[in-house]
From Swiss-Prot:
The gene is ruvB. Homohexamer. Forms an RuvA(8)-RuvB(12)-Holliday junction (HJ) complex. HJ DNA is sandwiched between 2 RuvA tetramers; dsDNA enters through RuvA and exits via RuvB. An RuvB hexamer assembles on each DNA strand where it exits the tetramer. Each RuvB hexamer is contacted by two RuvA subunits (via domain III) on 2 adjacent RuvB subunits; this complex drives branch migration. In the full resolvosome a probable DNA-RuvA(4)-RuvB(12)-RuvC(2) complex forms which resolves the HJ. ATP binds at residues 23-24, 65, 68-70, 131-133, 174, 184, 221. This is Holliday junction branch migration complex subunit RuvB. It comes from the Bacteria. Mg(2+) binds at residue 69. Pfam families: AAA_lid_4, RuvB_C, RuvB_N.
Length: 336
């Protein structure tokens, strides 16, 4: 099993990227959630526009699916400039980045997704571009090689990453603004689901939007994916209108429970509870018990369960919390 196979995966498919583009907010006034980020960016953008400057370089980090690309689009729209988009793995050679930089207009935004995956050679080109708006290019090879400097227009680099710790210090230090996106609160997700439903022309009650939001794991991308599947269910099994009851029926059918857990989440927790009496259990034993690789458990399954307080990592192994026992209606053992 890989993360992309799961309905509640925070990763995006190409089809979802296209579908989500139509319902993304375009301006800060439409941006829901992340109140601290929103208020700070409003000030930074207004200040840059009043001075007639490019916005400082911006690093956005946080778990996948929280709207890093959306925020980059909003920044470009608010600044009234073009947005050029690429990603770390695509920029294989220094020339790839140089070509993008030399085609920028003044104050344009260059958005690099997965910026932690830039190669060292490409990263070296970014340093003078970010600091001095200059491009240092080597022409020729061997003894005949020479360096030339190309002046660049003032621009804004927006880097997005799910792994801020993987960025090198020299790159991280060149960002004047750093924003962390947090998991969304249920009321904010409910608002997002309702807005998406209206854009899709759906008849959906507030309670229906709330039911989807509760199971979306704090992630707008998951909320919109669940909404599309609930829409399918409502159109086939009912008259297309989505109430809380219909949303719950659809999500139960899709094996997404009230906490947003899918079959694999529940399988892991039940293995710890049933097979290992709540733990502690070593990672290798747990992997064998559920038929998954240890890397899948560590990187895909565990993080959300730990973050929500259903699983603990201890020096002796993984343990189910009281909250996990209660989730399945099982009485936890008495603590010695």
């Amino acid at each position: 099993m890989i993360e992309a196979d799961r309905l509640i995966s925070a990763g995006a498919t190409i089809a979802e990227d296209v579908a989500d583009r139509a319902i993304r907010p375009k301006l800060l006034a439409e941006y829901v959630g992340q109140p601290q980020v929103r208020s700070q960016m409003e000030i930074f953008i207004q200040a840059a526009k009043r001075r007639g400057d490019a916005l400082d370089h911006l690093l956005i980090f946080g778990p996948p699916g929280l709207g890093k690309t959306t925020l980059a689009n909003i920044v470009a729209n608010e600044m009234g400039v073009n947005l050029r988009t690429t990603s770390g793995p695509v920029l294989e050679k220094a020339g790839d980045l140089a070509a993008m930089l030399t085609n920028l207009e003044p104050h344009d935004v260059l958005f690099i997704d997965e910026i932690h995956r830039l190669s060292p050679v490409v990263e070296e080109v970014l340093y003078p571009a970010m600091e001095d708006y200059q491009l240092d290019i080597m022409i020729g090879e061997g003894p005949a090689a020479r360096s030339i400097k190309i002046d660049l227009p003032p621009f804004t680099l927006i880097g997005a990453t799910t792994r801020a710790g993987s960025l090198t210090s020299p790159l991280r230090d060149r960002f004047g603004i750093v924003q962390r996106l947090e998991f969304y609160q249920v009321p904010d997700l409910q608002h997002i689901v309702g807005r998406s439903a209206r854009h899709m022309g759906l008849e959906m009650s507030d309670d229906g939007a709330l039911e989807v939001a509760r199971r979306a794991r704090g992630t707008p991308r998951i909320a919109n994916r669940l909404l599309r599947r609930v829409r399918d269910f409502a159109e086939v099994k009912h008259d297309g209108a989505i109430s809380a009851e219909i949303a719950a029926q659809a999500l139960d059918m899709l094996n997404v429970d009230a906490e947003g857990f899918d079959y694999m989440d529940r399988k892991l927790l039940l293995a710890v509870i049933d097979k290992f009496f709540g733990g502690p259990v070593g990672l290798d034993n747990l992997a064998a018990a559920i038929g998954e690789e240890r890397e899948t458990i560590e990187d895909v399954l565990e993080p959300y369960l730990i973050q929500q307080g259903f699983l603990q990592r201890t020096p002796r192994g993984r343990m189910a919390t009281v909250r996990a026992w209660n989730h399945f209606g099982i009485t936890p053992p008495e603590m010695p």
